[in-house]
Design a protein with these regions (language model features):
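C-terminal cap/substrate-recognition region of VAO/PCMH-type FAD-linked oxidoreductases
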Residues: 70, 75-206
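FAD-binding core of FAD-dependent oxidoreductases
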Residues: 1-122, 126-129
């Protein structure tokens, strides 16, 4: 579960037992970023081999696309390094092979990114009776939503209070300023359905 960060060249080496939250905390201290899993306790080994749709993946790519090398033990017990220059077929296979990968990865080499300076959330909640309208709207605007936004819709049986089911429209946003984040989530405020929302919260830093 080790973490070694090279700030000079923007890379990191991690063990497969490293947790997403542990890596994120270590990178935050250095203002660096990696598209880690959304939950703190997700193990990075399985997450990376499965592809890894993590934070800010629409901007930085899937987590597996940011794996630049692996150290892997093969079936015959040989330890080899794989990157774009050597044993590149192993690196290719590791990017999404999941539990079917034919080796044991003991170390991942990762490409890092500058850390977004602002992370925020825009939230709107609708009653279930508006489901079809909200889905139709989301289908229409979705392709044009900024890559900085993770456009999500979540059914929550407590969205509008105890035993009151609702549909949460959430827009986590990662940018370099509050102004840029505000502009990126403006499509929610401009929605023709905004008057039907039971709750609309302003853009909040998280």
């Amino acid at each position: 579960n080790g973490i070694a960060i090279n700030e000079a060249d923007g890379t990191a080496m991690i063990g497969p037992g490293c947790l997403a939250g542990e890596l994120n905390e270590a990178l935050a201290k250095r203002r660096l970023f990696f598209p880690v899993a959304h939950a703190y306790t997700v193990g990075m080994g399985g997450f990376l081999l499965q592809g890894g749709f993590g934070w800010n993946s629409r901007t930085n790519g899937l987590a597996c696309q940011n794996v630049i090398g692996i150290d892997v033990v093969l079936a015959d017990g040989t330890l080899v390094h794989a990157n774009e220059r050597e044993n590149k077929e192993l690196l290719w296979a590791a990017r999404g092979a999941g539990p079917g990968f034919f080796g044991v990865v003991v170390r991942f080499h990762l490409k890092l990114h500058p850390r977004p300076k602002f992370v925020g959330l825009k939230l709107q909640v609708f009653r279930i009776r508006h489901l079809e309208d909200v889905l139709a709207w989301a289908d229409k605007v979705g392709p044009d939503v900024s890559p900085a936004v993770e456009f999500q819709m979540v059914f929550n049986r407590k969205a509008l209070g105890i035993f009151s089911h609702g549909l949460e429209v959430m827009a986590p946003v990662l940018t370099d300023s509050w102004r840029a984040a505000r502009d990126a989530v403006a499509f929610i405020n401009e929605s023709p359905l905004r008057s039907k929302a039971s709750l609309t919260l302003p853009l909040m830093p998280i």
